[in-house]
Amino acid sequence: MGKLKKKGERGAATNYVSRNQALKKLQLSLPDFRRLCILKGIYPVEPKNKKKVNKGSTANKTYYYVKDIQWLAHEPVLNKFREFKVFLRKLKKAIAKEQPGTADRLEDNKPVYTLDHIVKERYPTFIDALRDLDDALSMLFLFSIMPQTDKIQAAVVQDCRRLSVEFQHYIISSRSLRKVFFSIKGIYFQAEIQGQTITWITPYQFCQDPPTDVDFRVMLTFVDFYKTMMGFINFKLYNNLNMHYPPVLADKTDKKLDTNYCKDTEVEDEVLAALNHTLKIIQTQEEDLEVDEFPIDPNSEDAEAIQAQKEEETKLERLKNLFSECKVFLSREVPRETLVFMIRSFGGQVSWDVSTAIGATFAETDESITHQIVDRPSQGHQFLSRYYIQPQWVADSINQGKLLPVEEYFPGEELPPHLSPFVKEEEGDYVPPERKAIMDQEMDTNQNEVTEEEEVPDMTREEKELAVAAMPRKDRRLYEKIMHSKKKKRSEVRKLESKRKVHDEEKAKKKLKSS
């Protein structure tokens, strides 16, 4: 007769381990354990039956998979954490004994770990890294404008700033930007890189006051990993475009004016951060390959799909060169870096006043300027050869894929609603009048391309009632729930439409009074 197994020695209980047990096994402190889990991508799990895992107890505990903890035990970074612990103990002892020579020697030999192998381990292919790029970009752009504090070092801010500027230069060079949206939280951007849609948010350029209730140690661990990951991604992206990495300016001409605003050693970095100069491309002897075009057989099965793909490519090429014929000047009060990034990503030329920032390419007095972006109701001196518009015109033009009329965006005018390009209305949802107008225009342009389909006759009320009565009880309950949710959605839509109607009436009354 075999030995009886005790409770908790088999089944689900052996698949999980509590956090305290994991700390004892790895011989780590809680902050080091958290840092290691973040770097390796290990997250807590919720067992299906806590009683079985916790030997009948229902106390709240954090659990991990046993396999994950065993995997962490073989991580090379774990040894570096232990070496760093020994280093701190020796350094503290040398300082207490007033041995500056020993302390300096220990500082020079401080243990440092690299995360290259972890990045390659978590992202076996480049596409895997691109799919996980959204959070990395949002975090790096956030820390790129953070002030230096006792928790945030200046070197971290500089690295985040450098990596974010390099990524923006790639987007400009490859014309990969697709959508922009100004929100209360920040500015949302969406780009398409190698078939992957990447969305990130950048904060507005204001002075940031870091909150005290945020654990910056956890956030800085994420930043540490994202910096290494972003370095690999930027190198690969630049290599695909045959550009130097780190980026090098294509035209290193006279910059005497630039040295008036920064040190000589910082000029090139500041000009790169201005996003207004092209980067140097590695010259290759390979000739540009031209894609052969073959006539489309109208009788083939894929004729419609091929034609639709061609039209989509033409539309995308037109979007990439949206501002190619625009020469834009930015006033002091507008968000310069954001607008430069947006306009140059679609082929436009941008500049600003020389005293505002480094990197200006032409002056305000240039007669070839087509648009000047302002954000104040009145201007001291106006040129008749250009349009004065508000910044929202740039974002709305990008989202609609065409240069919009400028009359609604003149200084002092009440701007049209800034609609989010990320919202996709489903059947029965509330659609604002402005969105309806855009959708109607798109339907008019595509009217000739839509093929006529056979109309399916609607069921009468009696036929619907008979069909519902013939349903099984389970299907009928599901049908009633669906109809109830649709009815609730319709009532909410009616409320929003009535609110919008009242708003439009009040707006019309104000216009009449002002006139």
UniProtKB/Swiss-Prot annotation:
Looking up Pfam families in the UniProt record yields:
BRCT_2, Pescadillo_N
The record's listing under InterPro entries reads:
BRCT_dom, BRCT_dom_sf, PES
A single GO cellular-component term on record? PeBoW complex
> Region Disordered: what ranges?
477-515
Using the UniProt record, give the first listed, main subcellular location.
nucleus
Subcellular localization(s) per the UniProt record: Nucleus, Nucleolus; Nucleus, Nucleoplasm
Please explain the role this protein plays, according to its UniProt record. Answer: Required for maturation of ribosomal RNAs and formation of the large ribosomal subunit.
* Protein's recorded name: Pescadillo homolog
